[in-house]
C-alpha cells in the first residue's frame, strides 16, 4: 500500500481485495513505511539496512504483487517509489522481475488516481513487472464507497471481484 495514513482509504480497498481472494490464495501486506530512503552508498552486505533485506526477502517470496496506492500530485507517494527503488537494487537482482502485477488507485477525487496509476505503470515497465491492462482499476470518489462501519459497499465489491478475477487469470497464465 502506498498510503501511510492510519485510516487510509487505500488500506480499506486493499483489505477488501484480500477478503475477495478465493480459497488457495493468500494475501500478504508487505511493510514499506520503515524502509530507509534508497542510497547506493549503503548497498553493501555490511551496510545494507536490515529493513531493506527484510523487504527484499518478503517480496522475492511472493508470486505476484497488487499495488494499491493513492495519488499525490499526479504521482505515487514517495514511500511507494522508495519501495520500488529498494526492491530493484542492486542492479541485476531486482525482486520485481517477472512478478505479475496489478495497479489499483483510489482517491477521493473523481478521476480515481489516474495520474498515479499511469506513473506507477511506467516504473513497472522498466522493472519488468507484467501488469494487468484491463480492466483498469481507478477507484474515484472512494469516500462515498465506504459505509458507516468502514467497509466497502456491496456494489463496489462486485467491481473489485471482476478486477481480481481478471488479475488471477492473468497471473496464472503468466506462471503456467
What label would you give each PLM region?
Residues 1-25:
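N-terminal beta1-alpha1 ligand-phosphate binding loop
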Residues 47-127:
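Helix-loop-strand module that forms the ligand-binding subsite of alpha/beta enzymes
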Residues 2-3, 32, 106:
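Cofactor-binding loop segments of dinucleotide-utilizing enzymes, especially the Rossmann-like FAD-
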Residues 22-29, 130:
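A generic structural motif
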Residues 130-176:
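Glycine-rich phosphate/pyrophosphate-binding loop and the adjoining helix
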Residues 32-49, 146-147:
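N-terminal beta-loop-helix "entrance" segment that forms/cooperates
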Residues 28-37, 136-144:
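Short connector loops at secondary-structure junctions
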